[in-house]
Amino acid sequence: MHSPHADKGNALDTVAHKTLTRGWQAELDLRFTRAAHKTVLTSARHVGPLTVQRPFYPEDDVCHLYLLHPPGGIVGGDELTISATLATDSHALITQPGSGKFYRSRGPQAQLRQDFYLAPQATLEWLPQDTILFPGANANIQSVFHLAQESRLLAWDLLCLGRPVMQETFSHGTLRNRLEVWRDGTPLLIERLHLEGGSLHTVARHPWSGTLLCYPATEKMLDGVREQIAPLGDYAGATLIDSLLALRFLGHDNLLIQRVMRAVWQSLRPQLTQKPPLLPRIWQT
């Protein structure tokens, strides 16, 4: 497991760092612990334009947190690093008020690295809004979940290639997207998506691509998910391997995808956490 920092209490340290040649170098390090009857964000250290809003508690004990990406999106040369560590018995739900955006690059790569470290009995719901890849973007995204045997995870990774609402396809650009799940140092899932030169053959020319993860899951949960994703058609499926449920889809209709993904989350959450599916307030605005 990732060793916690030595500092204690609430920490919110900010240092802006941008260079003319490399863009933003931004970091965000979050630490969650269980204190008394609720999960507390004990440390939120950030460098550059990555930050969070003040935590709130619509269901008393779970820490709901909104992650704020750089204003105006991510451009070539930006390097963003996000790390979240959840101590034993903590439970955090992290989402975003808006879509992540990777804009057209004149050459330099934009990098986003996200690491999540869950102690035994820790629960993470990682539910960001979709990430939009503008035509001409050059993006390298890596998301890694480090679990213990008794951790609980409910997460998704939603990508929008181009701006289909504006009739813009991902006609040129590069995307390297890597998604990993490890349990006690053993890989449960390593998934790669590589798009080069605007070619969308890998995704059968669908502008929407995504994965939903649930751990630990059961055959009953898998059967329920397979029923719920039927409206997405032939380009959606779900598997259960080593207690990790992975739902994958390609699609054209963002409203249908959003509706199905939220319905799956609403179904899985009570089974995984014994808590009702309370929609994040920001989703309803």
Curated annotation (Swiss-Prot):
GO molecular function of the protein, one example? nickel cation binding
Gene Ontology CC terms, in alphabetical order: cytoplasm
Which residues, by range, are in coiled-coil regions? Answer: none
> What InterPro entries does the record tag this protein with?
UreD
* Pfam families registered for this protein in UniProt: UreD (PF01774)
Localization annotation: Cytoplasm
Which terms are listed as keywords in the entry? Chaperone, Cytoplasm, Nickel insertion
Q: How does it assemble?
A: UreD, UreF and UreG form a complex that acts as a GTP-hydrolysis-dependent molecular chaperone, activating the urease apoprotein by helping to assemble the nickel containing metallocenter of UreC. The UreE protein probably delivers the nickel.
Q: What does this protein do?
A: Required for maturation of urease via the functional incorporation of the urease nickel metallocenter.
UniProt record similarity statement: Belongs to the UreD family.
Q: What is this protein called?
A: Urease accessory protein UreD
User: From which organism does this entry originate?
Assistant: Citrobacter koseri (strain ATCC BAA-895 / CDC 4225-83 / SGSC4696)
Q: Which gene encodes it?
A: ureD
